């Protein structure tokens, strides 16, 4: 039986390297590789994009759009890890846990957009609550994200690990303070929001691992923390990779690095003693469920392969 062929366009980048490492020991698929000297050659890329059953795009947005244009074989499928197509109407959003129907949509799709790391955590917390009517679409949501430096791409990785100059090299920095981070559109679309949230991302001097938090005044919502927890628990019941912690066993300290090297996503609901305030929290590996792990999960669905 012929093994499906997979090409990683952009395998030298942070996400591409992670995906290749996760796939390199697999015997149920064939990894196609490009000559390193020709990795930016459109003709060489086009040959592999059209020869592969699925190509994973680990590229900047413009290069990802170029890859789509280069893929002329109607049987060739694309899984895009960039921001370029996440809210595009012809692309299926690659968060299988979004709904009961989402895995089948991914299986059938020619084009799948891998979610962003911050938005994975935010959507995982928001989508079940807006779907259940516990959080209105126009509620003023505030989101904070805290990521290791690998979330900033190859240049920031080199700045921390090789001492190269970079404006975001430092022990802890807040950024995107113009409130226009690129993960906001997908967070709104798939988190069920009509009102633009305030999102403030932060990057620290650890390599990988992230948390995403959403503080809420429960009196403004008219619901209890227990109701929010119940909706999340019901939505993710039976999921392999997403877990909702029991409120009584919440850790007092959330270490963003706990899930490094996994495709897991942990969700928490914290509540004040007076029941007036809550914090929703998500913890994941920004290179795992936030990037490479999610891509492999989606790839397995697209190819009909066992979830490894």
Curated annotation (Swiss-Prot):
Give the UniProt keywords, A-Z. Amino-acid biosynthesis, Arginine biosynthesis, Cytoplasm, NADP, Oxidoreductase
Q: Which Pfam families match?
A: Semialdhyde_dhC_1
Where is it mostly found?
A: cytoplasm
- The residues responsible for catalysis, as annotated, are 117
The annotated pathway is: Amino-acid biosynthesis; L-arginine biosynthesis; N(2)-acetyl-L-ornithine from L-glutamate: step 3/4
Which EC class is this protein assigned?
oxidoreductase
Q: Which InterPro entries match?
A: AGPR_AS (IPR023013), AGPR_type-2 (IPR010136), NAD(P)-bd_dom_sf (IPR036291), NAGSA_dehydrogenase (IPR050085), Semialdehyde_DH_NAD-bd (IPR000534)
Localization, UniProt? Cytoplasm
Cite the SUPFAM superfamilies for this sequence: Glyceraldehyde-3-phosphate dehydrogenase-like, C-terminal domain, NAD(P)-binding Rossmann-fold domains
* PANTHER family linked: N-ACETYL-GAMMA-GLUTAMYL-PHOSPHATE REDUCTASE, CHLOROPLASTIC-RELATED, N-ACETYL-GAMMA-GLUTAMYL-PHOSPHATE REDUCTASE, CHLOROPLASTIC-RELATED-RELATED
Query: What is the designated name of this protein?
Result: N-acetyl-gamma-glutamyl-phosphate reductase
- Which species is listed as the source? Deinococcus deserti (strain DSM 17065 / CIP 109153 / LMG 22923 / VCD115)
Q: What's the gene?
A: argC
């Amino acid at each position: 039986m012929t093994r499906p062929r997979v090409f990683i366009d952009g395998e030298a980048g942070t996400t591409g390297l992670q995906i290749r490492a996760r796939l390199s020991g697999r015997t149920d698929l064939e990894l196609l590789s490009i000559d390193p000297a020709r990795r930016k050659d459109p003709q060489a890329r086009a040959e592999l994009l059209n020869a592969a059953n699925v190509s994973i795009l680990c590229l900047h947005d413009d290069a990802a759009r170029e890859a789509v244009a280069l893929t002329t074989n109607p049987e060739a499928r694309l899984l895009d890890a960039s921001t370029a197509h996440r809210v595009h109407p012809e692309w299926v959003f690659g968060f299988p846990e979004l709904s009961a129907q989402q895995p089948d949509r991914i299986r059938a799709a020619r084009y799948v957009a891998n979610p962003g790391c911050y938005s994975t955590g935010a959507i995982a917390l928001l989508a079940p609550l807006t779907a259940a009517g516990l959080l209105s679409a126009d509620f003023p949501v505030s989101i904070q994200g805290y990521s290791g430096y690998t979330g900033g791409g190859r240049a920031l990785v080199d700045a921390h690990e090789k001492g190269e100059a970079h404006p975001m090299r430092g022990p802890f920095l807040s950024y995107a303070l113009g409130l226009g981070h690129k993960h906001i559109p997908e967070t709104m679309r798939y988190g069920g929001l009509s009102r633009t949230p305030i999102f403030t991302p932060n990057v620290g001097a650890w390599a990988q691992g992230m948390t995403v938090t959403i503080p809420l005044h429960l009196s403004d919502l008219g619901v209890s923390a227990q109701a929010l927890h119940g909706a999340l628990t019901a939505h993710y019941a039976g999921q392999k990779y997403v877990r909702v912690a029991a409120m009584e066993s919440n850790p007092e300290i959330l270490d963003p690095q706990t899930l490094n090297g996994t495709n897991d996503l942990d969700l928490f609901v914290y509540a004040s003693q007076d029941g007036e305030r809550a914090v929703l929290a998500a913890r994941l590996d920004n290179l795992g469920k936030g990037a490479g792990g999610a891509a492999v999960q989606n790839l397995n669905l697209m190819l009909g392969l066992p979830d490894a």
